[in-house]
């Protein structure tokens, strides 16, 4: 993450962008769209979501003009719209993983099966993956990482959410010589040392 601001600024100055495709326009997805809209050198260009209205709202909250937002149902429609500088919405996840201008697919649905399917399609189509879907990552993340490595693409979690934040803390503690014996839950949930799957089932 060091010097990412400089790298993105250089991309912007050379009139280039990292094109992002987002799957899932819920709370985390909307946050991604809004945050990226404030950054140089990156752009969320296409969103796949079950509800097109939610995806529209994500772009509108980020300051995109309504007339610049188009719905696409086919690969050719999506690519033509993006080449014309439009922001694309679709209900078809596969479009996000196939559309040529997209460099990176961000998975933010929170649904295990959808996350796995999205990552597999991204790998098959040579797209890098940022997995915000901790449910998928905890279930099949190591397998997806191995497949992505074999395909020569990046599979990664994200900074900011609890799993990424815990990993950053672990890496720092390990680097400065601490013997880390355990990592655990972040501050958002109460610590229950006696928790079992049965006692947490209703909360989950």
Which residue stretches match the model-derived regions?
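Predominant activation on well-ordered alpha-helical scaffold segments within soluble catalytic domains
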Residues: 33, 56, 120, 142-146, ...
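General beta-strand structural signal in soluble alpha/beta enzymes
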Residues: 89-91, 106-107, 131-132, 155-158, ...
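Rossmann-fold NAD(P)-binding glycine/threonine-rich loop
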Residues: 109-125, 132-154, 158-161
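Core active-site phosphate/anionic-ligand binding loop and the adjoining beta-turn-alpha structural block
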Residues: 142, 149-204
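N-terminal glycine-/serine-/threonine-rich beta1-alpha1-beta2 phosphate-ribose binding loop
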Residues: 1-119
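Glycine-enriched alpha-helix->loop->beta-strand junction motifs that scaffold or abut catalytic
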Residues: 101, 126-128
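Residue-level "edge-of-site" marker
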Residues: 50, 72, 135, 161, ...
